[in-house]
Amino acid sequence: MAMSSYLINSNYVDPKFPPCEEYSQSDYLPNHSPDYYSSQRQEPAAFQPDSLYHHHPHQQQRAEPPYTQCQRAGQPASVVMSPRGHVLPPSGLQTTPVPEQSHRCESVTPSPPPPPSCGQTPHSQGASSPASTRKDPVVYPWMKKVHVNIVSSNYTGGEPKRSRTAYTRQQVLELEKEFHYNRYLTRRRRVEIAHTLCLSERQIKIWFQNRRMKWKKDHKLPNTKVRSGSTNTNSQVLTGFPKPHWTPIAGRDTCMIYAPSLAVPDCETECRSGSHASDHPSLHFGPE
């Protein structure tokens, strides 16, 4: 029915597709003499790829991939497909080769990738591809260290001094609350606070040292870092207290035991009364 309607239509223009004389069904397989097939039957050891696969023509047509978009756009509805996927024109029509159609088909096919350069090896390409696909780590604002002093890029001197760390309000609030309960931190507690506030242990230690010095200054407490000997001499000179007087105390043995006392004895009173060292009740030179 399709062939009759195709031949009746006189206004139909000849289809344009590439030459297919060599793909026709009659010329697809070469014509051989009967002796050629008889010679092949006599040689069973020869390799025959067609004998390995026995398929029906309809099954083979289903297994073949569908025709490409280029063939679909250039052929009419009445064109017959061969089992091999080639286009067969209807009988009675003369086909003319059209170079434009072939050029259009070539443009549809993708171009192969360019070959790698001589200096670049496949190993280097494989090593560079994971680095390019690796994502940069995400850095949040609270993870960045804020510094007050910023060294300019034109600075050519020696190594600049360590910049002062500016703590955020939240960090200062947490540190003040911890200092309110504990003025001295243990190592374990210092590590916990450092992880919580995203600071280093050294920063926590220095902050508590400075905070303790400020607290002592506000409460007017003496500095504990000064030597104890110099502190005692300075306090005696400034206050004007007398030096302690050593008085003997009787003991069980003959040796004398002295105890300090702040009372200074009056020599004139002892001389006038005529008291002797032997009459003094607290002095004993030997056993009784």
Swiss-Prot record:
Residues 118-132 have a biased composition (Polar residues). Disulfide bonds: none annotated. This is Homeobox protein Hox-B4a. It comes from the Eukaryota. The keyword Transcription regulation applies. Residues 160-219 bind DNA. Residues 10-136 are annotated as: Disordered. A motif (Antp-type hexapeptide) lies at residues 139-144. Sequence-specific transcription factor which is part of a developmental regulatory system that provides cells with specific positional identities on the anterior-posterior axis. GO terms for cellular component: nucleoplasm. GO terms for biological process: anterior/posterior pattern specification; embryonic skeletal system morphogenesis; positive regulation of transcription by RNA polymerase II. Keywords: Developmental protein, DNA-binding, Homeobox, Nucleus, Transcription, Transcription regulation. Belongs to the Antp homeobox family. Deformed subfamily. Pfam families: Homeodomain (PF00046). CDD domains: homeodomain. SMART domains: HOX (SM00389). The keyword Transmembrane does not apply. GO terms for molecular function: DNA-binding transcription factor activity, RNA polymerase II-specific; RNA polymerase II cis-regulatory region sequence-specific DNA binding. Its main location: nucleus. It is found in: Nucleus.
